[in-house]
């Protein structure tokens, strides 16, 4: 995908989201809602996001170790926080993943493909876990909340996950992938898809490890959705927590769209649209989305502080010797 196409897509999508928000919300009401934010709930949302980072670092260490790359969990935790900081500048959270790869490869020269594969595999399993959570959330909400308007979107993600699982896990899909390779190269997806494919097939004979990584991913996603619930409670939205297990996975997937400025306006528009379908006022829903944006900003603070400290100290990333 060319930079021009990405920029045009970003401008169009962001402008559409901003226009939708201007149409729906009242600024004065929104400011009043934010002024009455319950800080305890907001602090809980921030804490949930931060305390799960070392768990993600441990999960990543398992995948790296399978490739004979040994890294300490504190350093991997640092890499995650730095990636979150970078993600505030680069388009979508995928930009932060690229930073993780670069920093790790500096310490393990010549292992670019392997490191990229582990990060892309993390993303793939994370997407599958997110879709599974969304499906479970829909089942739990049946008869209590009407979220049928979003059923089609969840269905698209479920179908896409099934298709991708077939393409990347089934050997019979290899001829199809070879035929599609020119298309992937044209839209600049060939390298990340190949990295994911190679990573998956490296772990084909290690199903227990894949299952463990997926289980941890599912657990972390389950806990992190509670941060959305806490941010909503902070502005007085009192809905059953099960609703957020429909909303959260869809939000996580929407945030991966490459045509956003770190989710600016798109995230808030999704909050207004989804919560509005459940009777929540637009200004209150926007306030919840804005607070969740602040949560992601605070999640990036440790990484920003690390970069500033290392810059002042003039340190470099040391290489790890192998063998």
Residue ranges and their predicted role:
Residues 1-81, 140, 145-256, 282-290, ...:
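Predominantly cytoplasmic-facing regulatory/coupling regions of multi-pass membrane proteins
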Residues 96-105, 261-277:
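Re-entrant/interfacial helical elements at transmembrane boundaries that shape
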Residues 84-94, 111, 123-135:
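Mid-bilayer segments of alpha-helical transmembrane spans in multi-pass integral membrane proteins
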Residues 73-78, 96-97, 107-122, 280-291:
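Membrane-interface alpha-helices at helix entry/exit sites of multi-pass transporters
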Residues 132-144, 277:
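Transmembrane alpha-helix termini and helix-breaking/packing motifs in multi-pass membrane transporters
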Residues 65, 77-109, 193:
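Extended non-transmembrane interhelical loops and adjacent amphipathic helices
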Residues 120-128, 293-297:
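Selective transmembrane-helix segments that form parts of the transport pathway or gating/packing helices
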Residues 83-92, 249-264, 268:
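Transmembrane alpha-helix interface/packing and boundary motifs in multi-pass membrane proteins
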């Amino acid at each position: 995908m060319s930079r021009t196409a990405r920029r045009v897509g970003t401008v169009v999508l962001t402008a559409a989201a901003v226009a939708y928000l201007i149409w729906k919300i009242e600024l004065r009401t929104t400011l009043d809602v934010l002024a009455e934010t319950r800080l305890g709930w907001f602090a809980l949302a921030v804490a949930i996001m931060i305390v799960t980072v070392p768990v993600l670092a441990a999960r990543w260490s398992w995948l790296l170790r399978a490739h004979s790359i040994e890294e300490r969990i504190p350093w991997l935790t640092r890499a995650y926080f730095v990636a979150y900081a970078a993600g505030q500048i680069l388009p979508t959270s995928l930009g932060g993943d690229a930073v993780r790869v670069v920093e790790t490869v500096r310490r393990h020269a010549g292992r670019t493909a392997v490191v990229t594969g582990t990060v892309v595999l993390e993303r793939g399993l994370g997407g599958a876990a997110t879709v599974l959570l969304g499906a479970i959330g829909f089942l739990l909400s049946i008869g209590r909340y009407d979220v049928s308007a979003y059923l089609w979107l969840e269905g698209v993600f479920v179908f896409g996950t099934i298709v991708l699982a077939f393409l990347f896990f089934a050997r019979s899909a290899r001829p199809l992938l070879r035929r599609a390779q020119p298309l992937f190269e044209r839209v600049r997806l060939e390298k990340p898809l190949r990295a994911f494919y190679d990573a998956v097939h490296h772990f084909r004979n290690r199903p227990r490890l894949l299952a463990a990584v997926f289980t941890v991913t599912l657990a972390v996603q389950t806990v992190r959705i509670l941060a959305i619930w806490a941010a909503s409670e902070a502005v007085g939205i009192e809905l059953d927590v099960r609703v957020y297990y429909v909303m959260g996975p869809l939000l996580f997937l929407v945030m991966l769209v490459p045509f956003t400025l770190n989710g600016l306006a798109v995230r808030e528009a999704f909050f207004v649209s989804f919560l509005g379908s459940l009777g929540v006022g637009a200004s209150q829903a926007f306030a919840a989305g804005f607070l969740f944006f602040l949560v992601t900003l605070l999640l990036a603070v440790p990484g920003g502080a690390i970069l500033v400290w290392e810059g002042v100290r003039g340190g470099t990333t040391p290489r790890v010797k192998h063998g």
